[in-house]
Amino acid sequence: MKYLNNVSYKDCVGKVCKSKSSGDFKVLKYNDARNVEIQFLKTGFETVTQLGNIRNGNVKDPYSPSVYGIGVLGNKHPITINGVLTREYKLWTSMLVRCYSDNFKKRQPTYEGCEVSDKFKSYEYFYEWCHKQVGFDNDGNGNPFHLDKDLLIKGNKIYSESTCVFIPSEINLLLTKSTASRGQHLIGVYWHNTNKAFVA
């Protein structure tokens, strides 16, 4: 059998090996065949794996861009709970799809040129940012607010912590459908800096 990395327990320590999808990694310590410590060279992430996985290159770095070649999952927060995708993960991947999926932009050309900020490319950062925002969980009646990038800055093309807010679905629908001329925000709506909320 041909291995991606031809190493044995006798000579693996110190070797730089290749993974199938996360770049090169170095073997730091061999404890036994099921407990081998490694470190990915690009990100510095350390983990424990099996010797067989090292030979086959079947090890993954959660800090290597893996979602649309740009999103970094990290290792701190779940993407599913009891087999169900988390709201944070669905929001994050939906944002990446809108900006980096060619197929999506063919169907929705208004998203052409949209980007995600460097911080929002990290699921860990986005997850924690969401939990600090008013309206992330719900509007008080159990209805989730929508993530929006257009209300604070007219014509905005960047999803970031300084341009995104959670807004009621009704306002989001008006923003989507309205073609009327307006100011910086929706007609009759302004952002109250002190209260960190929208006022109509």
Predicted region positions:
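Short helix-coil boundary/hinge micro-motifs
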Residues: M1-T47, D61-T93, V97, G113-S117
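Short, surface-exposed polybasic/aromatic micro-patch for ligand or macromolecular engagement
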Residues: N31-I54, Y190-A200
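Short, cationic Gly/His-enriched loop motifs
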Residues: I38, H77-S101, K106-A197
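Short cysteine/histidine-rich zinc-coordinating motifs and their immediately flanking basic loops
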Residues: N53-R55, T179-A180
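Short amphipathic alpha-helical linker/capping segments at the junctions of internal repeats
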Residues: I54-P62
